[in-house]
Amino acid sequence: MKPTSGPEEARRPASDIRVFASNCSMHGLGHVFGPGSLSLRRGMWAAAVVLSVATFLYQVAERVRYYREFHHQTALDERESHRLIFPAVTLCNINPLRRSRLTPNDLHWAGSALLGLDPAEHAAFLRALGRPPAPPGFMPSPTFDMAQLYARAGHSLDDMLLDCRFRGQPCGPENFTTIFTRMGKCYTFNSGADGAELLTTTRGGMGNGLDIMLDVQQEEYLPVWRDNEETPFEVGIRVQIHSQEEPPIIDQLGLGVSPGYQTFVSCQQQQLSFLPPPWGDCSSASLNPNYEPEPSDPLGSPSPSPSPPYTLMGCRLACETRYVARKCGCRMVYMPGDVPVCSPQQYKNCAHPAIDAMLRKDSCACPNPCASTRYAKELSMVRIPSRAAARFLARKLNRSEAYIAENVLALDIFFEALNYETVEQKKAYEMSELLGDIGGQMGLFIGASLLTILEILDYLCEVFRDKVLGYFWNRQHSQRHSSTNLLQEGLGSHRTQVPHLSLGPRPPTPPCAVTKTLSASHRTCYLVTQL
């Protein structure tokens, strides 16, 4: 603040508005509240100050409103890397069960649930499979496990995988992990399960990724008995390329690869980063499939969990698991959790209808993950084998040329280049930007700063001390002064009446409770009640 000048201002209290206006660093106040009478110049300065303050407050309100809308912006960038983690690759044969592995006991328990067969059709279906009918006196097993059926009758990778190479080095079924999906028994390459080291690549282009040759075993496909959701009409495999943290939803996101073709899949890694509320709607909380929700919240909500990391597909899968577990008291084979696997009857009467109803209602509210990795893909294909190579492949694989054309496919998955894209949401308006805008508007319109605000607060404290606290102090001082005057008046009246009294000598008066010394040689005593 500016120093006080002049004897007149020096005598004024600090709470005086003129003293504050003449010393405050805020522009214009000295012209409004300065010394002198009311004039046109003072009025114009007052109008200018009021208009500037109003404009400043309006701009501050607009900036605060914009900040509270929590806008965000998306930044797209491309970065280079010397080494990239190779994605997980999940493979599923489109045919869920091999016809050669089905037994009369399987048809008795699961024929209706999986194939839509009536009991009277079992014998005809077995004949269509080329299998003998059930012997006379056939007795089904007392119990049946759907998980064991898929594990036993699903296609084996040992039979399907004809050749495997990663970065030019041989690989085999031991490099794949068995996983169950809605399509049955599947296999994942580079899953990272059980703490296995993730494979990486240091070069892009063909020959620097995964090269496999598969036999789809079309002779093992189930006959199409009737129009049923579980019986496929196509031949080939489904492939999903995904991150190791994300469970495969291959029935919805898988790519179709057909026999008789070599398919090339060029990938580019994309790292996505989204903002949590209120700037965005992402989540990093996992949904526990074993958690039993409250009746008012049947599907529950994501709850913090250190493992596994939250993914969109993982949330949907956990949501489906909880829904089926609540409706049916069991789970389907591909669903995670500790709930018992549904029986074939529960599959048919409860689990399948519950999943279909849930998908129609879109009951799972799964937000985007705050951080995720996905892979952009470009596909191309050529026919195999060529006429020149058909005889060579037939000798190498010990298969006929016709069999190779109908059952064998090749798949090459590789990175296009060792670079990756980043898609990142950022806050469009930070708190520092808000404070900077407020400071700029403050300096532009009223010529003030943060120290000016401190001066105003200091002035308000002076006003409070002088006006409010001073009022109570003066009131208390006035009451104390009135009591003193009353006491002095009482003393004066008694002192003037003493000479008119004709009292004889009396013994000395003992000391009393209230005394007032009038002189060095005489002391007068009064009772408290006389005051």
UniProtKB/Swiss-Prot annotation:
Disulfide bonds join C92-C186, C164-C171, C282-C370, C315-C366, C319-C364, C328-C350, C330-C342. It is found in: Cell membrane; Cytoplasm. Pfam families: ASC. Residues 1-43, 461-531 are cytoplasmic. Keywords: Cell membrane, Cytoplasm, Disulfide bond, Glycoprotein, Ion channel, Ion transport, Membrane, Phosphoprotein, Sodium, Sodium channel, Sodium transport, Transmembrane, Transmembrane helix, Transport. Residues 285-307 are annotated as: Disordered. Inhibited by the diuretic drug amiloride. Inhibited by the diuretic drug triamterene. Potentiated by the vertebrate neuropeptide FF (NPFF) and the related FMRFamide. Specifically and reversibly inhibited by the a sea anemone toxin APETx2. A motif (PDZ-binding) lies at residues 528-531. GO terms for biological process: detection of chemical stimulus involved in sensory perception of pain; detection of mechanical stimulus involved in sensory perception of pain; detection of temperature stimulus involved in sensory perception of pain; membrane depolarization; response to acidic pH; response to heat; sensory perception of sour taste; sodium ion transmembrane transport. One of its GO terms (cellular component) is cytoplasm. InterPro entries: ENaC (IPR001873), ENaC_chordates (IPR004724), ENaC_CS (IPR020903). Changing Q530A: Loss of interaction with GOPC. No effect on interaction with LIN7B. NO effect on interaction with MAGI1. It comes from the Eukaryota. It catalyses: Na(+)(in) = Na(+)(out); K(+)(in) = K(+)(out); Ca(2+)(in) = Ca(2+)(out). Forms pH-gated heterotrimeric sodium channels that act as postsynaptic excitatory receptors in the nervous system. Upon extracellular acidification, these channels generate a biphasic current with a fast inactivating and a slow sustained phase. ASIC3 is more sensitive to protons and gates between closed, open, and desensitized states faster than other ASICs. Displays high selectivity for sodium ions but can also permit the permeation of other cations. As a neuronal acid sensor, probably contributes to mechanoreception, acid nociception, and heat nociception. Can form homotrimeric channels. Heterotrimer; forms functional heterotrimers producing channel with different properties. Forms heterotrimers with ASIC2; gives rise to a biphasic current with a sustained current which discriminates poorly between Na(+) and K(+). Interacts with STOM; inhibits ASIC3 acid-evoked current. Interacts with LIN7B (via PDZ domain); increases ASIC3 expression at the plasma membrane. Interacts with MAGI1 (via PDZ domain); probably regulates ASIC3. Interacts with GOPC (via PDZ domain); probably regulates ASIC3. Belongs to the amiloride-sensitive sodium channel (TC 1.A.6) family. ASIC3 subfamily. This is Acid-sensing ion channel 3. The gene is ASIC3.
